[in-house]
Amino acid sequence: MTVLERLSRAGFRDVTTVEPVTGGLAADAGIAHREHGPPVFVKTFADPPGDDVFAVEAEGLAALRAAGGPATPDVLVADRELLVLTLLRPRPAGEAFWERFAVALAHLHTSTVHPRFGWHRDNWLGQRRQVNTWAGDGFAFFAEHRLLRWLSEPRVAAALGVEGRAALERLCARLPELLPERPACLTHGDLWRQNVLSTEDGQAALIDPAVSYTWAEVDLAHLWTTAPPPEARRFFDVYAELTGLDDGWRSRMPIIQLRQHLAVVAQFDDDWGAAETIRATLAPF
């Protein structure tokens, strides 16, 4: 079934064209232009990885919005085959946008502190299920459900080999020494900068979440996985001022970033250097 047919079945019968958009890695996405209404954002999978993939994404967007942090788009349709959202705008140029985003993200993280790590249901990171079983120990949660869970993936096993696997296991055993003990808070969970857009009035808005309650630094590390644009230089300073984040977070970042690098290696033939980065991070272990 084509995207136009799926949209028509969902009630959008006035769509004339669907303009593909780039930036996403796991799904097909586009802007649906309509005869009698505003354009909307649409997302589909040729072969959905699960029946609940869009339902849990919609729920994640709702949770982020309810927390009063960065904005999220309105969900118009979320079924097995289709996600339709109100259309957001590209990020505006300039430091002011990133400073506003820092304030909103700091509010999200500081206002949602939670006694446990996880989420009330599993969700998805790309086309792989993200296990969110509740845990009281953040180190055990991150080790089991965010790092070691990737070792069963064939591409990860091939990239790491026996020595790399053992190094990752040793690193996980030492997480309480390597990372500070921090509370859980609500996180976006897939916060690379392509998932940061803008509302009409220039406020930061987020898409494509993989929410859970975990360390706030998971979001920061993900945002820094690719070099931030020059206009974002004040983002981290503003965030630190509002949250009390210590200067050592940058040195911890490569360990936390292992999660997204492992996810990339697991899911894509072209890993954009992720396997090499993983091996470099694991080398001391």
Predicted regions and their residues:
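Short, low-complexity, intrinsically disordered N-terminal peptides in bacterial proteins
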Residues: 1-11, 35-38, 283
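An alpha-helical support segment within catalytic cores of ATP-dependent transferases
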Residues: 2-8, 113-188, 199, 241
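Conserved N-terminal boundary motif of the eukaryotic protein kinase catalytic domain
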Residues: 12-19
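ATP-binding pocket architecture of kinase catalytic cores
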Residues: 20-140
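Short, solvent-exposed loop/turn segments at secondary-structure junctions
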Residues: 47, 78-82, 90-91, 147, ...
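Active-site Asp-x-Gly
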Residues: 51, 136-143, 182-186, 193, ...
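An acidic site on a long C-lobe helix of protein kinase domains
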Residues: 97, 190, 254-257
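A conserved long alpha-helix in the C-terminal portion of kinase-like catalytic domains
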Residues: 149-173, 177, 215-218, 222-285
